[in-house]
Amino acid sequence: LVGDTFTHLTNGNKGYSVHGKESKYIKWVKDHPLAEGTFYIDNTINDGIGDGRKGLKYLWLLESKHIKPGMVESIIDNKQLVEDTYETIFTHDQRLLALGDKYKWVPAQGFWIKEPKIYEKTKMISMIASNKRMCEGHVKRLGWVERIGDQLDLYGRGFNEIADKEEGLCDYMFSVAIENGEYETYFTEKLLDCFATGTIPVYLGAPDIGDHFNKDGIIDLTEEFEVSEEIYYSKMDAIKENLEKAKEMEVLEDFIYRRYFQ
């Protein structure tokens, strides 16, 4: 694995793409002569082109275009060189997926919840946010905090800090989930963590989210969104379906292995 996107493990090897999770099928190492292939993450595109490593090379784009601007454009501008270097390019970006068979879809993130299930609900609605302002999505999220923060239980860095996301989701029927960007096929743990706790997301993000999950189990975030205990339990079939769909995306390494290597 080339790139510092993932957390380092205490044994000196790399961690995994999803916070607190390990893959069932893939083990990342820094350097190993028997490695079956090398993955290059995000901005390490040029490392793979010029480092002389043997064996198959794969490029994996995890971050959104709002956090890592210019990555997709760089690949499009150097399409032939990238395709000659990499066996497969894994991405959630539709501009790349439209370029051909070398480009394979992977969710932008898995989920962080340790035990995915439908938890007993005792509270109405929460929101997990932070005070970061690195991109448009951060600013938009803070705008919604200002508008509706007094109507829900607010958690996150700079607000009511919590050790684990379960604290802000498990007890709640609904939770506001706002992605860092609003474009097709881009969704992250902000959405999947809701599904993994049986919580209905009040969502602002991928406009095509209904192509991936049961839209009846998602409420669009608007100025007039409505939540109630009656609404929650009327959507239980969709809640169960979205939980099962989310489980398939829990750890991205496992998603990649099952879909593209098995």
How does the language model describe each region?
Residues L1-L61, K65-Y155, N160-A177, G181-Q262:
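Pol beta-like nucleotidyltransferase catalytic core
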